[in-house]
């Protein structure tokens, strides 16, 4: 990833004007609206950090949560912190800025991290679906299959594939000539706005990028769907109502996160976006990049007794230390 920190301006110097920065319009409005948005996103960011940080701390400190399911959940919370950090801090700076400018290299760095972390999230959701499938459909074999070592390999696989998939296509996109307007009507550097500003068409690069993104979305979503079909079939065969409720409580929260994330991502990157208003595109991007990390702690702890107890112990322990 180190080559992303060098000058990423296009190699084609024949153009009369080379873009050295982009203007992110974000959410335009009067000063009062900007202050409201700044306060709103700052609160969302702090709550996201606190909520997901609490999950990480609870999983790390509570021996009862040292299981594959909570190990994956802790890593997922860590991922959510990085994912939301790829967008909101720059949004906050952009809201207060008069120029709304982001450097050329900074724009493509954000582009890289945003898509790499998004891909990692897709893979994590698939791995978590696999974990729930094994736990409910094959409970006897689960401890032998989902060992700590195997779980660590799955987590490493998600991070490696997520971050090794986009350096080359994004590097080639950064080498396209950007010699005209530099205004991006978005709050982040995304594929469609950047390609619209390029002075030369790049159908092959664009095709490779979208094919790669679509394949990740398709295969992970199909795997999750298959896992839940098998899982729900097994749940409905459980004779006791209490057993069915327990099974639903362990997988229901994951299903909510999957639906929220994939539903908005597919509207943005699988269906054509040229007919979608710009404001709606921004809102959809906010849902899967900001709202999902915010509600992740609430969704995963709402019906999970072990996690609620662990978080309660964390808060209780903090109060004791403050009073002592």
Swiss-Prot record:
**To which protein family does this belong?**
Belongs to the G-protein coupled receptor 1 family.
Q: What does this protein do?
A: Odorant receptor.
**Name this protein carries in UniProt:** Olfactory receptor 11H4
Question: Hey, which stretches end up on the Cytoplasmic side?
Answer: 57-64, 131-149, 228-247, 303-324
Specify the domain of life of the species encoding this protein: Eukaryota
Compartment(s) where it occurs, according to its Swiss-Prot or TrEMBL record: Cell membrane
- Assigned keywords, A-Z: Cell membrane, Disulfide bond, G-protein coupled receptor, Glycoprotein, Membrane, Olfaction, Receptor, Sensory transduction, Transducer, Transmembrane, Transmembrane helix
In what way does this protein cross or attach to the membrane?
Multi-pass membrane protein
Which ranges does the record list as Extracellular topological domains?
1-35, 86-109, 171-207, 269-281
What is a single cellular component term in the Gene Ontology annotation?
plasma membrane
Chief location category: membrane
Span-the-membrane segments of this chain are: 36-56, 65-85, 110-130, 150-170, 208-227, 248-268, 282-302
Enumerate the InterPro entries for this protein.
Answer: GPCR_Rhodpsn (IPR000276), GPCR_Rhodpsn_7TM (IPR017452), Olfact_rcpt (IPR000725), Olfactory_GPCR1 (IPR050939)
Does this entry carry the keyword Transmembrane? Answer: yes
List the cysteine pairs that form cystine. 107-199
Q: What Gene Ontology molecular-function terms does this entry list?
A: G protein-coupled receptor activity; olfactory receptor activity
Q: Which residues are glycosylated?
A: 12
């Amino acid at each position: 990833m180190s080559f992303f920190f060098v000058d990423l301006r296009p190699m084609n110097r024949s153009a009369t004007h080379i873009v050295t920065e982009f203007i992110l319009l974000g959410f335009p409005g009067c000063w009062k609206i900007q202050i409201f948005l700044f306060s709103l996103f700052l609160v969302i960011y702090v709550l996201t950090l606190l909520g997901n940080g609490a999950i990480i701390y609870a999983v790390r400190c509570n021996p009862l949560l040292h299981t594959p399911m909570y190990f994956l959940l802790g890593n997922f919370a860590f991922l959510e912190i990085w994912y939301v950090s790829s967008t909101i801090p720059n949004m906050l700076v952009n809201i207060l800025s008069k120029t709304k400018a982001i450097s050329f290299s900074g724009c493509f760095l954000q582009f890289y991290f945003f898509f790499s972390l998004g891909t990692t999230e897709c893979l994590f959701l698939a791995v978590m679906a696999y974990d729930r499938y094994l736990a409910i459909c094959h409970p006897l074999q689960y401890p032998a299959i989902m060992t700590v070592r195997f779980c660590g390999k799955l987590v490493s696989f998600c991070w490696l594939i997520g971050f090794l998939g986009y350096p080359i296509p994004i590097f080639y996109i950064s080498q396209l000539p950007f010699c005209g307007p530099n205004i991006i009507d978005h709050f982040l550097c995304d594929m469609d706005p950047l390609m619209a500003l390029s002075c030369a068409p790049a159908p092959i690069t664009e095709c490779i990028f979208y094919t790669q993104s679509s394949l990740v979305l398709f295969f992970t979503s199909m795997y999750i769907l298959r896992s839940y079909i098998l899982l729900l079939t097994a749940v409905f065969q459980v004779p006791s109502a209490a057993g069915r409720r327990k099974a639903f409580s362990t997988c229901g929260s994951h299903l909510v996160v999957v639906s929220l994330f994939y539903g908005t991502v597919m509207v943005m990157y699988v269906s054509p976006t040229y007919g979608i208003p710009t404001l709606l595109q921004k809102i959809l991007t906010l849902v899967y990049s900001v709202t999902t990390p915010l509600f992740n702690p609430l969704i995963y702890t709402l019906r999970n007794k072990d996690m609620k107890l662990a978080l309660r112990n964390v808060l209780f322990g903090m109060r004791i230390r403050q009073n002592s």
